[in-house]
Amino acid sequence: VLSPADKANIKATWDKIGGHAGEYGGEALERTFASFPTTKTYFPHFDLSPGSAQVKAHGKKVADALTLAVGHLDDLPGALSALSDLHAYKLRVDPVNFKLLSHCLLVTLACHHPAEFTPAVHASLDKFFTSVSTVLTSKYR
């Protein structure tokens, strides 16, 4: 459960990210593919080379979904229901991959905003990404 302090940290961080969310999403996705090569199996039709337009575009989709979630911290299941359906029923993404991408998102944000990435912000973002991952995998059961 996200506390009021977590929600404030998440919103403040997302405000600082601003227009870079899509860029960071693409970078985090590239980092995920490089660090965890098995995640590439879900994208056989993509050019997965560094700087690929397809990876950047999908990274922007990830960032857009997270931006939507930031705007609905009190109702993540409602906000992400369609995305949960897509990943569970159509794409059938292994739930562990959300954890791997979440880790790479944290690393990417820490690299770009080291001064703002305090232990409290790190913990809040980790809880947020875990909450989003939980919602996205909730329909697997």
UniProtKB/Swiss-Prot annotation:
Red blood cells. One of its GO terms (cellular component) is haptoglobin-hemoglobin complex. Belongs to the globin family. Involved in oxygen transport from the lung to the various peripheral tissues. GO terms for molecular function: haptoglobin binding; heme binding; iron ion binding; organic acid binding; oxygen binding; oxygen carrier activity; peroxidase activity. SUPFAM superfamilies: Globin-like (SSF46458). This is Hemoglobin subunit alpha. Heme b binds at H87. The modification Phosphothreonine is found at T108, T134, T137. Residues 1-141 form the Globin domain. GO terms for biological process: hydrogen peroxide catabolic process. The modification Phosphoserine is found at S3, S35, S49, S102, S124, S131, S138. The modification N6-succinyllysine is found at K7, K11, K16, K40. The lineage of its organism: Eukaryota, Metazoa, Chordata, Craniata, Vertebrata. InterPro entries: Globin, Globin-like_sf, Globin/Proto, Hemoglobin_a-typ, Hemoglobin_oxygen_transport, Hemoglobin_pi. It comes from Procyon lotor. O2 binds at H58.
